[in-house]
């Protein structure tokens, strides 16, 4: 999902939340933002971390419960334990963001990783676009509402801060539990010589 499209989704959510917080009808670009747009925007915003976390769970399950399959592909992890989970999580995060980076401890040039990363890339790119086009279509069907005293201004510093808070809460906290647990476990693990 490209930055512009993600930002569009987060603006829809921020407009809706801000409008409800101050008791005004949520409007964006002269169109009312209602529950249908909000539901689609929420699904789109949560789809990205959902795909990443589900595929990380699948790869972890396969690594633990099907070691014969992992060994037939040459093994995946050079760093066992929780750092290996971090490597798997980062691999799928990198694929979903389409940036191509990764931890080097993960042996990811195998059929399993190539196929699953390709699936993550497709799901993370094209499914959100469907939702964003649906939101645009719903907004296009609505009548234009002229700006009034009750219209929430979207070009102010306050709205910018609200948008930042929404992005932080939804995007950053989606991965907070797994990152917090991995960090705590890394700290508590005894140091191993590599």
Residue map of PLM features:
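Alpha-helical transmembrane segments
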Residues: 18-34, 134-154
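Final/C-terminal transmembrane alpha-helix of multipass membrane proteins
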Residues: 159-178
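Single conserved hydrophobic/aromatic residue that forms the stacking wall/gate
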Residues: 1-3, 185-194
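Alpha-helical transmembrane segments and their helix-start/interface "positive-inside/aromatic belt" motifs
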Residues: 33-48, 154-165
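Membrane-embedded translocation segments of transport machinery
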Residues: 4-27, 31, 39, 43-87, ...
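Pore domain of cation channels
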Residues: 4-18, 105-140
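Juxtamembrane boundary at the C-terminal end of a transmembrane helix
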Residues: 174-188
């Amino acid at each position: 999902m490209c930055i512009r499209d993600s930002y569009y989704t987060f603006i829809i959510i921020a407009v809706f939340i801000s409008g409800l917080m101050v008791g005004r009808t949520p409007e964006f670009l002269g169109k009312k933002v209602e529950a249908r747009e909000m539901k689609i925007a929420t699904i789109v915003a949560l789809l990205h971390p959902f795909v990443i976390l589900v595929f990380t769970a699948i790869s972890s399950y396969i690594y633990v419960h099907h070691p014969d399959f992992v060994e037939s592909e040459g093994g995946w992890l050079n760093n066992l334990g929780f750092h290996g989970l971090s490597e798997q999580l980062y691999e799928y995060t990198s694929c979903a963001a389409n940036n191509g980076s990764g931890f080097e401890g993960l042996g990811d040039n195998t059929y399993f990783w190539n196929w699953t990363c390709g699936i993550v890339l497709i799901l993370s790119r094209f499914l959100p676009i469907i939702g964003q086009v649906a939101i645009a279509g719903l907004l296009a069907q609505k009548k234009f509402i002229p700006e009034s005293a009750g219209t929430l201004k979207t070009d102010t510093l306050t709205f910018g801060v609200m948008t930042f808070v929404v992005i932080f809460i939804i995007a950053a906290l989606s991965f907070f539990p797994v990152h917090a647990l991995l960090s705590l476990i890394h700290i508590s693990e005894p140091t191993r010589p590599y």
